[in-house]
Amino acid sequence: MFPKCCVGVALVCVVAGAKAQDLPFSAPSSVDSPAVPQAMADLAERLIPVYPKSNQLDYLNALFTLQAVARRYRDAGDTMRSIRAISVPDSQQRRDISLVFESYVLAKASEQNKTDSFTGAFSKQFRAVLAPLDNPDAYRLGYAFSTLPFYIRRAMAAALGRYGSASGVSRDEALSLLRLYLALETFSDINPLVGGLIAQDDRRRYEINEDSVIRTTDGATVSAVVVRPKGAARLPTLMEFSIYTDHAAEAAKESAAHGYVGVYAFTRGKGSSSAPIEPFERDGLDAQAVIRWIARQPWSDGRVGMCGGSYNGFTQWAAAKNRPSALKAIMPSASAVPGFDRPIQRGIYVNGFYPWVPYTTDKKWDDDATYNDDARWNLLNRTWYLAGDSYRSLERIDGTPSPIYRRWLAHPSYDLYWQKMVPYKAEFAKIDIPVLQTTGYFDGGHTGALYYFTEHHKYNPNADDTLVIGPYSHTGGAQNQSDDVLDGYTIDPAARIDIHQLRYAWYDYLFKHGPKPALLSDTVNFEVMGKNEWRHARSLEQMSTDRVRLYLGPALGASRARLSEQTPSAEAHVDQVVDFADRTDVNWTPPSQILGASLDTHNGIAYETAPFEHPTEIDGALSGQLDFIVNKKDLDISIIPYEELPDGNYLRLSEEFMFRTSYLKDPSHRQLLTPGIRSQIPFNCACITARRLSAGSRLVLLVSINMRQDRQINYGTGRDVSDETIDDAKEPLKIRWLGDSYIDVPFRKNLMTGAD
């Protein structure tokens, strides 16, 4: 599900780092400071007369923000009308957000002029814009109005922190900060009002049952929200099955708004169910029970499709494993594979899933306060890392029992405990319903989505399983509306699609004889970054036209080495030492930017090609072989591809491919290394990319050893890694990367000539 808290942030990202400081500005000490409103108003007033007018639309958009923050509300309303006279928003989301801000400033103008209270004026504005809309448009606009201020507040706090030591800000920085403040002010003021207004509007559109109870095959119960369009005949149902409870009614309502029965069912134990909450374990059978229940209802035409992402993507595969007859199609996005990509990623436990357990299991509803307690979880990671205790000690350090996480630690292999949760091997052959999967190059669920896709096609060559992938994040375009800018990278206009719109177009095609979405013209549909173009292929392998082998060659300097077609000499190697006992890097933060000014080679080596003479396109997954000698029985490795741009910036090309070498060949069976003996380990990256590299760019492959405070640390003894401690780090890891290491790069254009 898409967190509402992100909708408002999407259009108000803060741009920091501009060199010119045109406006003196002393940032308030915190977002809670009573000085914030006046400081923002003063900054807006000073920016109004100096903001450039070279582009009329850009100027008017900026002027609206400045006038609103300066409390010139009537002027801001006039400016919005001027904007509408010369421009139409380029996306549904932008149109909706602009209506939210316009409604807000008009209500504030009424309050300021003493013609009405803010509550009264805003309520009238809200009803006026929502009443004439059809169900889909009313749903989208209501969703925009419902944006939660929590993450906007967090972003505002971070922005003030960045400028805390500065004496001034540039015009662009000031405008970004003021846009963020306007979003925070707007959604903080309207949030207490919107829920009741939307509920009032919903009553004339939908039949809503927020607590349907369904009996499972073993006698337990699960609860569900059911939303139907008023006056509708029997309809197909679109269902989500989830451990998350926030926004359940809205998710079901979205499907009802598009002419389906919307059902949002919960993992047993959530909502009104009295059973224990156990993530993953019973969702498949319980989802099957809900599907059978739906098919028996008088409002159902007997056809059920599933949708949703992340955990809600996993539950679709869990349900399909059991092949309920009423389940006619699934559309999983950014799907999780329990035991394979969460809470373990290819053998490595990730700390981020430790707070996820209380978030989803401590209460009947999502425990947002606990999950968002960054201070608690950051302290846990830091304390554990500095102490060098075993991974099992997280529970003791945190001071709160976590029997579920303890249970997960008992299953480090992809064993029967995990295998029974989703289709496994030959079970994929029996899944013969249409499947549409979506994910992103920068989606943390990328690995899981590609696992399902490749296994389904492997065991069922005739599988009707289609993939859509582009430059998307987990909560952005992989599941929802694409971002415009993602962690510094400006997404191509062609890639800015709305996965929810695709969802309903696809289900209309399957269930209502609508046209097939044009985007789905082949099995693999991918956007090529930098080319602003979608390509289509029959398979992942056919994304590219050629594969070129590049060898991880000799060292070029500190943490740098050559990547080239030339086979290195037999004695070529690169030595690396990682001291697992050294925790002086405790304040190191892994880079999050997709586009950045430098490459962080922490515990890694960057292998780089010579600059390309011609524009060069890479489409698909890297594969290759790592050839090395190490003094340990096991190690954890990370591989990330980058483009070093001609201007010296670095663009990350995909999500990180990280793995434990002992589980790379077979996730269900650990195979240790022999210290001091040469190892050659083939790999196929579980992450893919598509990017047109410009002439003058280099391909850079960052190969790193995992050692960080937010992941399990593999000390290499060969014992269960959860039992290892810093006492096992007496001898640093010493690895010699040998010259027969290589990667096979999937090019569309020949590397050397640039020919097609």
Tell me the role of every PLM-derived stretch:
Residues 193-233, 612-614:
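N-terminal cap/lid segment of alpha/beta-hydrolase-fold proteins
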Residues 431, 437-439:
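Short beta-strand/loop motif that positions the catalytic acidic residue
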Residues 298-311:
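Alpha/beta-hydrolase fold nucleophile elbow
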Residues 307, 314-381, 441, 460-504:
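A catalytic-pocket lid/entrance helix-loop region that shapes and gates access to the active site
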Residues 385-389, 477, 482-756:
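C-terminal, loop-rich substrate-recognition/catalytic regions characterized by aromatic stacking residues
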Residues 134-188, 197-200, 257, 321-430:
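Accessory cap/linker subdomain of secreted extracellular hydrolases
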Residues 229-296, 478-491, 645-647, 658-659, ...:
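Cap/lid segment of the alpha/beta-hydrolase catalytic domain
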Residues 447-466:
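Active-site-adjacent alpha-helix of alpha/beta-hydrolase-fold enzymes
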